A protein has these predicted regions:
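Conserved RNA-binding domains used in RNP assembly and mRNA/RNA metabolism
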Residues: 1-150
Length: 150
């Protein structure tokens, strides 16, 4: 489901591997119509389980600290709307054309969301979630001398 900046929605199929590769996205609507949309006019692309549910995002914030590994972010759109989610902890994927966001409601209709960079005014990292990669602290050497040589 594609949400445009003007507020309209388009139910369509598209190739997710082509996202961010160009300034346009090619879609096939559920009516069988082939369209080319400009990325600058798209607010977000929601990859959904079914088209029957017309709500794009059930919940826009996490109720508690998320458990998925990645960067917990809050995205602020140009229209002052916002959504929280988890993005990959890989800056190469984030920097260029947009964000691939896992939404807060994992059991909802939306599986993941692509947000073009042109639709965003701010992305704030709220936390880093994942496995700690720290090495265990080395045992402190004994500063007290031994009484007997053994």
């Amino acid at each position: 489901m594609i949400l445009r900046i003007d507020g309209t929605r388009v139910q369509a199929y598209l190739n997710p591997s082509a996202l961010g590769a160009s300034e346009t996205v090619e879609i096939l609507t559920t009516d069988g119509e082939y369209l080319t949309l400009e990325m600058s006019k798209i607010k977000s692309i929601h990859f959904v389980r079914e088209f029957t549910n017309h709500q794009p995002a059930e919940r826009k914030t996490f109720l508690s600290r998320p458990k998925l590994e990645g960067l917990w972010v809050r995205c602020l759109f140009r229209d002052k709307d916002s959504i929280e989610g988890i993005v990959a902890n890989n800056l190469v994927e984030i920097a260029n054309h947009g964000l691939r966001l896992t939404p807060p409601d994992l059991h909802g209709n939306t599986l993941w969301i692509f947000i073009p960079r042109t639709a965003l005014s701010e992305v704030k990292v709220l936390g880093v979630v994942g496995i700690s990669r720290r090495q265990p602290a080395a045992a402190a050497s004994s500063s007290q001398p031994k009484l007997f040589d053994e």
